[in-house]
From Swiss-Prot:
Keywords in alphabetical order: Cytoplasm, Nucleus, Proteasome
Record-given protein name: Proteasome subunit beta type-3
SUPFAM superfamilies: N-terminal nucleophile aminohydrolases (Ntn hydrolases)
Signal sequence annotation: none
Organism: Trypanosoma brucei brucei
Quaternary data: The 26S proteasome consists of a 20S proteasome core and two 19S regulatory subunits. The 20S proteasome core is composed of 28 subunits that are arranged in four stacked rings, resulting in a barrel-shaped structure. The two end rings are each formed by seven alpha subunits, and the two central rings are each formed by seven beta subunits. The catalytic chamber with the active sites is on the inside of the barrel.
Record flagged with keyword Ligase: no
Its job: Non-catalytic component of the proteasome, a multicatalytic proteinase complex which is characterized by its ability to cleave peptides with Arg, Phe, Tyr, Leu, and Glu adjacent to the leaving group at neutral or slightly basic pH. The proteasome has an ATP-dependent proteolytic activity.
Length: 205
């Protein structure tokens, strides 16, 4: 078993019309043993940036703290919030810095420009190689199932409510096919005007 799948868990980011959704499951485990059913993997960086982290839980926590420190330092130095593409570049460079002793995490990043409504999605591997599609990105133990569900359900120009419905159905259906993810999910729905968090009930078995 890969160390990336040891703690289980999956994340998905999906783009719509001037909005995006980042969604993660709630399971934390040690291989097939479930430790907790209330461990979401989303990190709200600011009003327009949400990051999901999958991989080894200890590295998720440490890496999230280091990312938070770097973004706060950026805010102090630049006297403004970091934008989406700069944040993705920051995360990618932090992972590449540690390439010889890597963080066992796979970030999924969703961002929106508050003025223009432009959505930017990015996912990286554990050494920071970015993937920047226009529709959706996913990572975690049920990434293959998520890809299939997203290909079937996603379409361009989805409004926030439709996008949430599609992302939630994709996550729940994919988790039903994976024993290392599941136990419900949590979603962050982000538009130009607001950020809303929703809890999604799922199977508890």
């Amino acid at each position: 078993m890969s160390i990336l799948t040891y703690s289980g868990g999956s994340c998905l980011a999906m783009a719509g019309k001037e909005c995006f959704v980042v969604i993660s499951d709630n399971r934390l485990g040690e291989q097939l043993k479930t430790i907790s059913m209330e461990v979401p993997k989303l990190h709200v960086i600011n009003d327009g940036i949400v990051m999901g982290l999958t991989g080894l839980r200890t590295d998720q926590q440490t890496f999230a703290q280091k990312v938070n420190f770097r973004t706060e330092m950026y805010k102090l130095r630049e006297e403004r919030d970091i934008n989406g593409k700069a944040f993705a570049a920051l995360v990618s460079s932090m992972l590449y810095e540690a390439r010889f002793g890597p963080w066992f995490v796979e970030p999924v990043i969703g961002t929106i420009d508050r003025k223009t409504g432009e959505v930017y999605l990015c996912a990286t591997d554990l050494i920071g190689a970015p993937c920047e599609p226009e529709d959706y990105v996913c990572a975690g133990t049920c990434a293959e199932s998520l890809h299939g569900m997203c290909e079937a359900l996603w379409r361009p120009g989805l409004e926030p409510e439709e996008l949430f419905e599609v992302a939630a159905q994709a996550m729940l259906s994919a988790c039903d096919r994976d024993s290392l993810s599941g136990y419900g999910a949590v979603a962050a729905i982000v538009t130009k005007d607001k950020l809303v968090t929703r809890l999604i009930k799922g199977r508890k078995d």
